[in-house]
Each structure stands twice: as structure tokens, then as C-alpha cells.
Amino acid sequence: MAVLTHNQASQKVDELRKKLDEWAEDYYAKDAPVVEDAVYDKAYQELVELEKQFPDLVTSDSITQRVGGEIKSDLSKVEHPVPMLSMGDVFSKDELKEFDERITKLVGHPVAYNVELKIDGLSLSLEYTAGKLTRASTRGNGRVGEDVTANAKFIKDIPQTLPEPLTTEVRGECYMEKEAFAKLNAERDEKGEQVFANPRNAAAGSLRQLDARITKKRNLSTFIYTWVNPPKNITSQHQAIDEMNRLGFHTNQTGQRLESMDEVFKFIDEYTAKRNDLSYGIDGIVLKVDDLSLQNELGNTVKVPRWEIAYKFPPEEQETVVKEIEWTVGRTGVVTPTAVMDPVQLAGTVVSRASLHNPDYLREKGVRIGDTVKLHKAGDIIPEISSVVLNKRPKDSEPYQIPNKCPSCGQDLVHLQDEVALRCINPMCPAQVEEGIIHFASRGAMNIMGLGPRIVKQLIDKNFVNDVADLYHLTNEQLSQLDHFKDKSITNLLTSIENSKQNSAELLLFGLGIDHVGAKAARLILEKYKNLEKVSQLTVPELTSIDTIGETIAESLTAYFNQPSAQKLLQELRDSGLNMEYLGTVEEEAPDNFFKEKTVVLTGKLSDFTRSEFTKKLQDLGAKVTGSVSKKTDYLIYGADAGSKKDKAEKLQVPMLTEQEAIAKIEK
């Protein structure tokens, strides 16, 4: 860090505090971080160093003197009898050595550590009275958290009653397993809802719900690792973990009691290599002085315990070269850029594409075709370009020019007011029509089985379908002209199209793909007004009278139905026999089939369906779709360019099916 004058340091401290406060609110209060942990940590450490150099600049409201984030939600507030402190963190093995040397100096002799995985989730406190769960709360700002007792009752691994009548408090981490996260995001994507950026956000958003029924559906898990007031016979951290496990708490059994830093470093190296194979997310390793009496002797600072430290994993990065920038048109006309890169192995998978989101983001990153870029996975899940390696930029490189024509129909692209996205506003744009029909047929909407992207594209190319109403006039003769579409597939598709006419009207409303009208909004509107034709005549005030339906949704829906083309489409659908009434929804158990109760993994590029559609198709059949191959996997289904998962399946002798073989099994 450059040497600063006092005035320069004061200005820099103010800038860092403002930035960190904004980021902390996004992270803690909104469960929607806008920067990577590594970016936040770097800024935080810079502030810590400046406050060390200029102690007079330290203030009580500095983020370095606080725990977590301020509480801004509608959940009831809970005061913690014993503050829930943050944890100090380091980013290198040298810093860990310094921590160990500091502890040794303070207590006068070497100590043993209980070394545990740092779970990437949301801190949680559980209080019991006479063995009964009486209160669950989040950390909040360390002094005051949020009451999530009602929600905790729906987390399966939290014991509601202990085997002994203890009055006590334990603490741990609430998290979402990678498989549950993938399933939740696939469902939200299918319904047109915003997906979560990573499992930590998903867990936090799911636990901090006002409606406990939502928490129940989210399949959360916990690891308990702290006993606030253990019985006197519990004298060590590893003993506390074992006893909490005996009492029925879900504890992480990977922790080890280690007596040397060489052993600690070996543990770190082992789990740095293993982290992508775990079913849950970890972002580091935690060292805790194992002896509880020494923990009490060492005590706490204002913000963190002196007896524990977290070693944070560095974000895994790889360098690759941008070969091209593709622009794709979504069903609402938003045109999104994607960087297409040389394939690289990153965090357990082969990555060759990363979203560039919108023109502003692309300009900010400064990415050009031919650039070498650093690539990481946001939340260990989503590929993201960290930066451009400028010293490797080709000499003949030129700034990338944002297109002004739609890549599908060639019409001018526009920026709508208050939007960063580029849009094509041509309602007959082939890409929008195609995406709109795919959405209409999706599981969350009309659930027309067998109508995947490949089939939709052929129907449009052959001019058999120009809008969703045309689906209800398809004939056996037309479908027989499609490539690789056999008699049974034709019969199944026509049957599914016919069956969709009986769907409840909220599925049809959602299927129309009206901007901002997701599955939940469609259901709420039809629950109140019962009939879709009536909904098409509603005013903005009538729509906003429904709880949670705001002006954005109401204005978008009324603007859509004010178009003569929308009224014409609705009339055509009614004339084709589609139900316009709200019927509610009924979930049915999957019938017996090849994939029922089987554990399945998908890998490679699929040609007939998107990954999300195929996942839902298998789940509808009662299959469990997971993200990693193990001895428990029943089948691996693979498409083109299958990578390490296929290799692992071969090694474990897991049965494998091509995409077409799997489809044949589904259609039997």
C-alpha cells in the first residue's frame, strides 16, 4: 500500500467505509451480494490496515468494529444474550502461522486446534428450554438478530426436542446443498422467477421468509458447531461436537483435533482439493483452540474471538482466450452478450462460456475478442470473467463494438427508459417467437411434454407455427415431416397438446410470457378473478388491489392485453378449446417408469432439451437428479462434449445412456 498523508488516509477511509457499508447491506440485509467475497475481503483488509496506521481514524460505527449487517426486515427482532460475533480471517498460510505464534505467546505454550470446514451459509442460533426448541434466530448485527423460529421447525435436521431436558443454546450454519440449490434455481428459472446467485444467498433468502411454508419447500440443512453454555464435563471443542451430535444435532464430522501447523496445512491442502466434490459449499477452514478453558482465557475483541481464525480459500481462477462474443435474444426481446472462450477446467467442470450480462457490464469489463481473461466461478457455481489480462492483449486488438441490430431479425435494437439492457421490440422476431413458444410449453407453464427447443425450431423453420395458438392446429402429417420424430413421439406430443387445454388458467397466463408476470403473480391474479378473459379487461387499480401485485406487474399486464394482437390470440386459444377458468393445482405421484426413484446425473451439451427442461422431465418421472457422479448414481445421461463426469462414471462403472437413449426410455 502506498504511503498516504493523514488527509489522504482520512478520505480513503471514508470511501472504503461507504463502499463496504453498501456491500454489507446487499450481503446481509438483501441476501444479494453485488461483488465477490474476494473483492469485499480485499477492500475490508485495506480499511483494517489504514485504521492500524491511523488509529485516530477508527470510529465506533466503522464496519471493522461491527458484526454482520444492520437488521432491515419485517421479521421480529431478537436480542442475543451472548453476542454472536464474527470471525477473524486470513488469506495465507503465513498469516495462519502468525496466528498460531500469537496464541502460543498469549497462553505460554503450544496448543491443539480443532480444525473444521468453514460452511458457506447463514449463521443460526438455536435455544432450548427443558429440551424443547423455543427460539431460532439469525446473527444479524451480532447483538440483535431476526426470529426465524417458525421457519426452523421446517428444517429437517434441527431437533425440535432433545433426548435430555436441557436448557441451552447452540449455534451453527444454515446452508443449502448444491443439489437442492440446482433444483431450486431450475424451478425458479422454469417459472420465470429470478434465480439465486449462489447457495449462500438461496439459504439466507429461504431462512428469512415471513411465510414458513416457503422455507419448508426449500430443503435447507444445518451444521451445528458451537455450544454456548456446555455442561461442565465438556472441556474441549471436539468433545462438544461429539456430544452435540449425540443429542441429535447435525454436526460436520470432517473436523480433526490437530497439534501442529504442518498437520493443519495438510488438512487445508486436502480440502482445497476436495471442496468441489462436497455436496455443500465451503469457503475456507476454521481453526479453534480446542481447550474450552483456554478459549475463555483468551476471550474476545470487540468484534471477534481471539481463539479462532478462518483461513479463506483464494478464488480459483483460470486464464483463457475469448474467441467470440455471441448475442442471444430472449422471449421478452432482451439481447444478452455471452463470451465464448477456449474450454478450461474450472472448479470441477469444463467451462467455455460466461455471460457478459448487458452492454454496460461488457464496457466496464473492457472485454475484446482475442483477449486473454481471468475466469472464476461466482459462488463456486456460475462462470464469470474477473478481469482482462492486458499485457497479453493482441497488438491489433480493437475495442468491441456493441451491435445496433437484432441478431435474429435484423431490426434496430433500443434502450428502454431505466433499463441497461438492449431490446429488440419486433413482436415477430423469430428468436422471440421461438423462445416464447418454448416458454409456453415449459413445465412451469402449459407443460407440453416433447415440445423442446429442437422441435420448436423445426416447427418455425417449416412455417407450421408462428405463435402459440398454432400449436393447437398441428397435425400428424405436419409432425411426420420433422427430423428424427417417430410415430410414438408424434402421438405423445399431440396427446400432451390436447391435454394442456384442460390446464388451470394461471398456467396459461404465465405461459403467455408477459413481461414481469411470473408464475406466482399469475396464480395470485387468477385466484382472485377466476377467469382469464376477465383478467384481460382489468385496470391497473384492480390489479394492484391484490396483495404483492405492484404497479410494474399491473402496467405490464394491462399494456399487453390492450394490444389487439393479444386479444386476438386469446380469442384463438379460447376457440381452440383452452380452459379460461382458475381450477387450482393438484400434484400427482409419478407412475411407474424406468427412471422412478433412480439417481441420475446429466452431463455434456443436450440437443433436444435445455438442461433445466430435461432435469424437470426426469423429476416428473420420480428421478433424483444430482450434480455429481458417485457410487450411488444409477445412470449418467450424456450429450456432446461430455467431460470429467463421464470419465468418473466409467471409472465407477456407472451405467450410461446417451441423450437419445434416455429419451427413448422416457417415451416407452
Curated annotation (Swiss-Prot):
Its EC number is 6.5.1.2. It catalyses: NAD(+) + (deoxyribonucleotide)n-3'-hydroxyl + 5'-phospho-(deoxyribonucleotide)m = (deoxyribonucleotide)n+m + AMP + beta-nicotinamide D-nucleotide. One of its GO terms (cellular component) is cytosol. Zn(2+) binds at C406, C409, C424, C429. Residues 590-668 form the BRCT domain. Keywords: DNA damage, DNA repair, DNA replication, Ligase, Magnesium, Manganese, Metal-binding, NAD, Zinc. The keyword tRNA processing does not apply. GO terms for biological process: DNA repair; DNA replication. SMART domains: BRCT, LIGANc. NAD(+) binds at D37, A38, V39, Y40, D41, S86, M87, E116, R139, E173, K288, K312. DNA ligase that catalyzes the formation of phosphodiester linkages between 5'-phosphoryl and 3'-hydroxyl groups in double-stranded DNA using NAD as a coenzyme and as the energy source for the reaction. It is essential for DNA replication and repair of damaged DNA. This is DNA ligase. The lineage of its organism: Bacteria, Bacillati, Bacillota, Bacilli, Lactobacillales.
